[in-house]
Amino acid sequence: MSGMTLTSQRNLQINFANPYIVIGQSVLLRNGLEGEIKSYKDLNNPKYTVVSKLGTTGDLAAKRYLSKAKLRLFETESEGAIEVVNGKADAFIYDLPFNAVYSSQNPGKLVHLDTPFTYEPLAWGVRKGDPDFVNWLNNFLTQIQGDGTYDKIYAKWFESSAWQKTLK
């Protein structure tokens, strides 16, 4: 399962099931800026270089909320985050879950401003014209939320970092 932010524009192209989680954009900040930058709003200045992944809601959020900052876009999340670690950019704007994991895997190399500054419901995307599948997904989500399965999955992947050890 992959995250896709449910937006009005995307909803013109595909249908969405009900959201299964709500996330938002957060900031990975270059070391040395933590006293100067306390919020994403502080980055809206031409002296700062902000990076994000091309074509994502991070890209859109940076353009919308940080229009005065210099913006550079990358093909992958990792390329953008590495720019911040290497001091070539001041901040990386991207999905909170990615930024939380990346900062925990790179302790002392950057600062995570972990309060999301956007509202982004994630949902499964389904091709137009398949209401039965959307209905099935919605019923499935309701079932696992009601029987405790959703809470167990959420705890494993979002409240614990034990799974990260299996990545190495």
Region spans (language model):
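Periplasmic-binding protein-like
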Residues: 22-29, 96, 100-142, 160-168
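A ligand-binding cleft/hinge motif common to bilobed small-molecule-binding domains
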Residues: 3-13, 61-63, 83-86, 90-118
